[in-house]
């Protein structure tokens, strides 16, 4: 996996069957490239670091929102505090969080101001209709999925909160029917998934120079791809429309051989910017991949880390010691009074003696 290779643009399907086949193969090749790359670099929200064109777009978006008579607020951040009813009050405080939120919508629409403006209005309308601001207080009946299917746990090396997703439990048919058996159950699950996302948003500062996005880790082991297609597409669409630029990096782990096929199905729902955030780890390479972004004491034990359920309730854990053993080196470790001898041969293979 190389962080320097940029994934190629998603292909545009041709109308002929031959062209469609080429399009599918291009999608599969695109997915294969993603197995080796992640080109995304998180953008700054500090005004002094923004180019003049982006500052102009931000000012134009604010001006458009200021024409709305009703207050607009997303994630608890007022976006048009100087709308017409309050325009005469020049002393009205300016919330610096508004710049962060509006820049997210602008980046999601490549700084096309009118498109970003429309996206803000649709998101605000959806949040009002969905009741997103109150969803954290709801009991949705998924206690048995907490800490298994979707949950916030720890943070990465840069302070981003980490959300883990694992849908392998739904290979059990009874579990699948209980959660996704009909439209009402699926709607309740989607509401619960939004609830988890809102927890992640609550953990962000949403301020220039602060932590303004989360990390998503998705475990594809045993994931029933066909059965979860409808739910996956709805979650992707809902999050892209209403949580723009909320994910700093998307890490897929335990990736099976058919991932390229799965990617070709979800690719039309993803922007190129979103796909540039992907990091892929096949089975057997999970811990090594996660350690690049998350310290071992914060990685769950099921993924090769040291963190167990409840470990973070009493504050941050004691940092783990990290080091690299080169070929031919001999290192002595002492773990809770037990001496461990670790040898590495010239090929880098390690042998541990207790």
PLM feature spans:
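Basic, amphipathic alpha-helical/coil surface patches used to engage anionic, phosphate-bearing ligands
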Residues: 2-354
């Amino acid at each position: 996996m190389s962080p320097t290779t940029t994934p190629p643009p998603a292909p545009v399907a041709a109308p002929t069957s031959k062209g469609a086949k080429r399009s599918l193969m291009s999608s599969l090749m695109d997915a294969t490239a993603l197995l080796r790359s992640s080109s995304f670099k998180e953008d700054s929200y500090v005004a002094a670091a923004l180019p003049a064109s982006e500052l102009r777009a931000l000012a134009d978006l604010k001006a458009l929102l200021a024409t709305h008579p009703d207050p607009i607020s997303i994630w608890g951040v007022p976006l048009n505090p100087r709308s017409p009813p309050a325009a005469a009050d020049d002393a009205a405080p300016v919330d610096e969080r508004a710049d962060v939120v509006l820049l997210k919508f602008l980046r999601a629409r490549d700084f096309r101001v009118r498109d970003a403006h429309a996206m803000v209005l649709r998101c605000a309308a959806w949040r009002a209709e969905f009741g997103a601001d109150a969803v954290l207080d709801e009991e949705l009946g998924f206690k048995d999925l907490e800490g298994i299917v979707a949950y916030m746990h720890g943070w990465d090396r840069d302070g981003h909160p980490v959300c883990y997703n694992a849908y392998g439990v739904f290979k059990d048919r009874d579990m699948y029917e209980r959660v996704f058996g009909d439209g009402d159950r699926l709607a309740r699950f989607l509401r619960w998934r939004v609830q988890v996302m809102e927890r992640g948003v609550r953990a962000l500062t949403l301020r220039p120079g602060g932590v303004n996005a989360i990390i998503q880790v998705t475990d594809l082991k045993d994931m029933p791809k066909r059965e979860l297609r409808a739910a996956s597409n709805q979650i992707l669409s809902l999050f892209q429309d209403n949580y723009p630029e909320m994910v700093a990096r998307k890490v897929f782990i335990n990736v099976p051989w058919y991932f390229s096929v799965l990617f070709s199905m979800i690719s039309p729902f993803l922007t190129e910017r979103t796909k540039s955030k992907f990091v892929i780890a096949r089975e057997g390479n999970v811990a090594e991949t996660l350690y690049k972004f998350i310290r071992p004491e914060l990685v769950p034990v099921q993924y090769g880390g040291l963190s167990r359920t409840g470990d973070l309730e009493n504050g941050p854990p004691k940092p783990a010691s990290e080091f690299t053993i080169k070929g031919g080196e001999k290192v002595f470790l002492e773990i809770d009074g037990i001496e461990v001898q670790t040898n590495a041969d010239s090929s880098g293979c390690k042998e541990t003696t207790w």
